Amino acid sequence: MRPLAPDARCAPSRPGRGPWYARRPVTTPSDPPAALREPPPPARRAGKAGSGELVFTRVAGRTVLEKALARSPLKLLAPKNHGQAAWVFVASFGGGLVGGDELNLHARVGRGAAALLSTQASTKVYRSPLVSRQRLEAEVQAGGLLVAIPDPVVCFAGSRYEQDIDVALADDASLVLVDALSSGRSARGERWAFDRYASRVRVSRGGRAVLLDATRLDPAHGALPERMGRFDALATLVALGPRAASAAEALLAPRPPPERRAELVASASPLRGGGAVVRVAGTSVERVAGFLRGALAFLAGELGDDPFARKW
């Protein structure tokens, strides 16, 4: 794990003297030997910019990963293709995003191809005064299908995170997208304790915007634990295009109103040209994951296997 930058806001100081790690130490006879003193805090580090490119192509009735390039700290894992779709898992070196890290990924899904973008585990954002960012730009050509269902983002206390997802679809291309967030490390008492979270999702079809969805959580607008109430996980699900039509239709079907103090609440809205966007809030990540897995059960047929298997 890379060392974290010291948080200057928490450093004790006296007027005119600056933070403790900037002062010259005063040696007295009672000071311990230098070898026994506590080491100084690590120097503030600038984040790293990682980038990647993926190209999926349909060849002889199945999708192949034609191109996969990654620059650290971005890491791409491509398991053996055992179905008609190609799978890629996106990760980062060090087990998460450290202050100032920025990951940019561009993906192109060719005509008639099918691709899955996922993660092996949640995306962890470590505490830092610097903002960590992720950006996904994707293009899906005619008849293609992109399934982007990463695990939830977990923002540690004091962290700052922003992400942008921009998907351009051909007129008859399809998309299944999940954007999910958990309250943090609640088992350690960190519940909605991050300093900033911002996510923007933009989807266009044939050059026309069909969805622009933004989520921003900032304690400057009010204490987050009180605003989020009993919920510990959020998700936005997008199902759009002919290859996701059955899922969109089921999601838009009338359903009874939620019970008082329900452990999961979901609300669906139609999208222009056929499709649905669903916003979900649950009392746990497992509750939200169960809803998503049921809503996206059809993906096993499109991808050759269940993308949620062996995860929860």
UniProtKB/Swiss-Prot annotation:
Provide the species name. Sorangium cellulosum (strain So ce56) (Polyangium cellulosum (strain So ce56))
Q: Which key words tag this protein in UniProt?
A: Chaperone, Cytoplasm, Nickel insertion
Cited Pfam families: UreD
Q: Where in the cell is it found?
A: Cytoplasm
Q: Which domain of life is it from?
A: Bacteria
What lineage does the source organism belong to? Bacteria, Pseudomonadati, Myxococcota, Polyangia, Polyangiales
Subunit info here reads: UreD, UreF and UreG form a complex that acts as a GTP-hydrolysis-dependent molecular chaperone, activating the urease apoprotein by helping to assemble the nickel containing metallocenter of UreC. The UreE protein probably delivers the nickel.
Q: What does this protein do?
A: Required for maturation of urease via the functional incorporation of the urease nickel metallocenter.
Question: What HAMAP family does UniProt report for this protein, alphabetically?
Answer: UreD
Know the name of this protein? Urease accessory protein UreD
The reply to whether Transmembrane figures as a keyword in the UniProt entry is: no
Q: In its keyword annotation, does this UniProt entry include Chaperone?
A: yes
Mention any one GO cellular component term assigned to this protein in its UniProt record: cytoplasm
A single Gene Ontology molecular function, please? nickel cation binding
Annotated gene: ureD
